Every structure is written in structure tokens, then in C-alpha cells.
Amino acid sequence: MQRSNPIKISDFNSDAYREAYSRINGLVVVGEGLADRHFRLLARSIPEDRDELERLAAMEGRHATDFVGCGRHLDIKPDVALARRLFAPLHQLFLDCDRAGDLTGCLVIQGLIVECFAVAAYRCYLPVADSY
């Protein structure tokens, strides 16, 4: 299996890069914040794993803060409004599952959908992460 090459961006200061990064940064910041809230709700639903889930929630919250800092380092403001609008249906679905006691639904949304998105989005940070 052939491995893909790392993303190559020659101009981190170009308008196109900054606009795209603003959107991705907003999605990652909001996504990490949602993960924090989701793990805290899961901690209520799974008391035997509460400590671990609260630890994961705190970690996600720190990630959100770190990604805000990464954007600030590049003088880019995250497009949080777009991210909130895009994540709203997924977050509402998580809340609906939580209210209905559908633990499996909550775990699928957080453990698969939100976390897989995060892993995919992190690839966009690789070219700038070392300098940050």
C-alpha cells in the first residue's frame, strides 16, 4: 500500500491558506469543545468510568485551547460561527440520544464520528505544528 505524502503548502501567509485554515481551525476548536461536553455527559451516564471520562473531557478542553493558540500564533481567527452551525445537528443528535438513554448512540457519535473527524482534521496542522 502506497503511503500518501504529507501536505505541502508553500505559503502559510497566502489569503487562500489563511481562509481555509480559519475554517478548519474553527471546526477543530468547536469539535474539541463538543468532545469535552460529550465526555462530561458520558461520565454521568457511565459512573463506573466517570474518572476516565472526565480526564478525557479535560484533555479535549485543553486541545481546544491549544488549537486557539495555534491559530493565534498564525494570526488567524477561527471561524467559530461556521463550525457551530455545521456541528449543531450532530451535537443535537448526541443530546437527543443522551436524553433518551441511548448510550450506544452517544458512544457512536463521540467515539467514532467526532473523534474520526478530529484525527482527519489534525493532518492539516502537521505543516505548522512544529513551529508552534
Functional labels for PLM-detected ranges:
Residues 1-132:
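Non-heme di-metal
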